Amino acid sequence: IYSSFSRREVLVAQLEVRAGNPPSGVHLLVQSQRMERFHLLDDFWVTWQQWFTELEETHTSLGVLSFFRSPQAHRSWVTASGAVLDGASLRLAAVDMPFDPEAGICVRAGFFALRAIADYYGIPYDPEPRPGDPISITKDEFLQACDDLVDAGIPVRDDRDAAWVDFTGWRVNYDVPLLSLAGFIMTPYAPWSSDRSFRFRRAGLRRRPTRP
C-alpha cells in the first residue's frame, strides 16, 4: 500500500512546479510556455497516461488509497487529476497547434481511471455522455482561460465558439466523476474541480468488494 501511495504522490508533488498551487490546467499550459517547455508536453502527457493507468489499478484493488491524503494538505490526487485533464483538454480544444494525440490519450486514460474509481464507490455518472451535454465549467470561464493563454504567448484558435464546443466534448467525459470524487473525498480547494464539487454522503454509497 505504501509503495502505491508513494508512487502516486511523487507526480502529485512534481505537478505543483508546473500547475501551481492550487493546481489548474490553465496554469499548467502557461507555466510550460514561460519555461520554454511547451514543446515537451508530449512527454508530460505520456507520463500522466501511465500515472492514470496505475491509479485505476491501485485505487480499485486497494480502495483505502483514495482516502490517503497527500503529506501537504493543499495537494490531492483528485485535484491533480483535474488539472492535468483540463490542461490536456485545453491543449486539444483551444490551442492553435496541430492535434496532439498524446494529450488525447491522456484524457482517455484519465477519465477511464476516474470512472473506474467512481464505480468502485457506486458514484453515479453517465457512461456515454454526448458532446452537447452540460458541464460545470461556464463558457465565460473558458473564454477567460483562452485570454490567459494568449497573454502568455500561446496561440489560441480564432474561432472561440468552436473551441468551446470542442472543450466541452472533452471535459464532459470526466466532469461528473471528477467533481463527485472531489466532494466524496473532500479534497482541498482547486479551480474547476473541488471549488464546485458535488457532495456525496459516504454512508449512502455502495462499495464494491476488494479484489482478491
Question: What is the predicted function of each stretch?
Answer:
Residues 1-2:
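Transmembrane alpha-helices and immediately adjacent membrane-cytoplasm interface residues
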Residues 7-81, 86-87, 96:
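Non-transmembrane accessory domains of multi-pass membrane transporters/channels
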